[in-house]
């Protein structure tokens, strides 16, 4: 079976007054219909820029190289007119901040209906009915009444439900969720994750979940890609990454999760800071922060498969972390 999305050798670069920044460096992954990929890592690791590259939404100073094939069609450098046909209809995105992603001057109903009128050619009455139906699907109370309200009249969780409804209106085959639970309290986060799981099953939608919240990833994702400084550090199933991580960075992220059943007096952290992308360290970008770094790490390793479906970007032997 051919994957829904096949990304190969993806690079994203930005020209700045100080030089060229490589935000995404030789990224490779595949995604099947109805499955969920979690992309995790610290801020600045290239997670969001990967999504923007796929959607054709990079800043004006950004360029993309490589290949991203969606249902047999190359997305990289696709003409804007063709890309506009794919956006919303086949690939949709939930943006990072629900507080600012909605137009404050337009009623919620108008914003939802606009999507269907633009992409599906629906008349006003049909677009209204479909919008109410989707608000019901995302568990919005009194959906019909909410259509006549403005964004400032909604809580953060309700706005996020509106964003999810808007993204799913055209029944896309791929949904990219960029930090969909940012600024939401934990109870609302849990509701949103449950909702996405239900919608995935109902519409067979593939999801790319971009987040630094590992708890979110554990609850919804089938596959996980750990990114650092624009590169893939480790890739595998959620079970492999959470229970059998083999890259020092992945292990550091897992160890840094606070545990209710732990006896530690202090939180575990990864020493140091993420690198400046204009001045990356020689070789492995994580080596200055890695307690296991050797001289060999001054040469960049390659992403290598070592287990069924699991890959890592590290010189250290797997056995060092699996004993």
Question: PLM ranges: what are they?
Answer:
Residues 64-74:
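Conserved ABC transporter NBD signature motif
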Residues 3, 141-144, 237-323:
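Short catalytic/signature loops enriched in Gly
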Residues 57, 176-180, 184-265:
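P-loop NTP-binding/switch modules centered on Walker-like glycine-rich loops
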Residues 74, 125-145, 254:
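Conserved ABC ATPase "signature" region
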Residues 75-92, 118, 240-245, 275-281:
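ABC ATPase NBD coupling module
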Residues 169-173:
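A short, proline-enriched helix->beta-strand linker immediately N-terminal to the Walker B motif
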